[in-house]
Amino acid sequence: MITPIHTQHSLILVYINIYSPPILSKLRTGFILWTNTQKTNKKRNMEDQFPKIETSFMHDKLLSSGIYGFLSSSTPPQLLGVPIFLEGMKSPLLPASSTPSYFVSPHDHELTSSIHPSPVASVPWNFLESFPQSQHPDHHPSKPPNLTLFLKEPKLLELSQSESNMSPYHKYIPNSFYQSDQNRNEWVEINKTLTNYPSKGFGNYWLSTTKTQPMKSKTRKVVQTTTPTKLYRGVRQRHWGKWVAEIRLPRNRTRVWLGTFETAEQAAMAYDTAAYILRGEFAHLNFPDLKHQLKSGSLRCMIASLLESKIQQISSSQVSNSPSPPPPKVGTPEQKNHHMKMESGEDVMMKKQKSHKEVMEGDGVQLSRMPSLDMDLIWDALSFPHSS
């Protein structure tokens, strides 16, 4: 009787010689239980891709090798650790010597033994339990979705964790998975070397704020060709680099130019000499420690001559600007006669006023304050005595 057995990856045709109906029924029920357990395990391990590939691959391999070992072994097999097969094979209906090969011919036995040298009978009872089972995480609230414009690159920590989780399964994964794992390890090493260098992704340039840069000024920066020097009293610098010494006179504040010098110290020394000549010991000097040098020397003679010439020039200008006294007046004889007549007329008027005053005083009226002969002014100036 030919019975097809369907699996996930292949179709196996098994020729079974039925010796006893109970054995066949037990075999079918055990296979159905095994397929149901595999379906539930696949649903649970849907999130982990690599363990799913590994278990499906290993179960298919074990299934095929178990069928061939079941057909070729001379001892009662243990297919995938199901105890029903062992109990069925221990049935008293089957003699041990009458079945050297259970379901196949000697030619098929040699073929299967050459393909699979190790029988399934050597597989332990808890073979599947020896594999590390993936722990199902507890149900946690789902994280909010990432709504950025760009995909996130895998972090180095996550890659190392996934590598450590996959390390127990490396011995069960075929060569194709080993090659992909090696490629991934190379990529991790490259990523480790790249993390030492500062890098920016396209998203950083897209979403980062632009930095403000100061505008370039069009005005030229003035380069100081001369070193900053100390400023002295009465000293200033020309725009071509020379130094000038000047002083003001104490009375009229007139500025006196003392000369042009090569250095600021020479100009300050000239100012000190002029200040000492004009003010003496009360002068404010740039170099008070060098006061003894100001009393003698060619510089003192030169500056003294400059000051004297300037003072003489100022005094001469003041004399020329002052007005000359008016000349004495010489009168003619006609002017003298006219002057005598004026004086005689004034004397007559004074005599008349005195006589008129005496007459008024005799009548009891005060006319001492009478300014003129105007009647309005006379009545305003009069003051009558109070009646008793």
From Swiss-Prot:
It holds the Pfam family AP2. Residues 314-366 are annotated as: Disordered. Signal peptide: none annotated. PROSITE patterns: AP2_ERF. The keyword Transcription applies. Residues 231-288 bind DNA. It comes from the Eukaryota. This is Ethylene-responsive transcription factor ERF062. It comes from Arabidopsis thaliana. The lineage of its organism: Eukaryota, Viridiplantae, Streptophyta, Embryophyta, Tracheophyta. The gene is ERF062.
